[in-house]
Amino acid sequence: MVWLNLTDYKKQEYMELRLNAPLGEHIRLDFNPLKVTDTSNSSPSWKNWHCYRKPLRIYSPDFDILVSYFIKAYPIIDASDNTERDSFDVCFDNWIKQDDWIKIIHNIEVDLINFSKEEKEFLNTFIDWITDALQHTSVIVVEGNL
């Protein structure tokens, strides 16, 4: 089961993806798939995007390699309120829809030839996690704590 009960967010098991980030690093991006509810016209609560059993966590400076691809995808339509967002925010929530993830993944895959073996493994693991998460949702909320 990929989803926890909405009250069990403390049971999440973050997958920490590291390339060069030191173990003591605290600045990070968390990737939380949104659990879509059957209730129409309701705004998702914090619990709806903190109930995926194995969310992804990437620390600074490792997320810098990804942020450049996020920036290329903007402007996007924010999935939380359907307003246009001009830029990716490493300090706050970014509600990214499946179509935008597909663009981001494509742009990474086109560039894979330019990376070292370790960087390719990092990026391919990221792509695999996003692709798997998108089997269960159409929105992934990326939260930064910078």
Language model features with spans:
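Conserved GNAT acetyl-CoA-binding A-motif
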Residues: 140
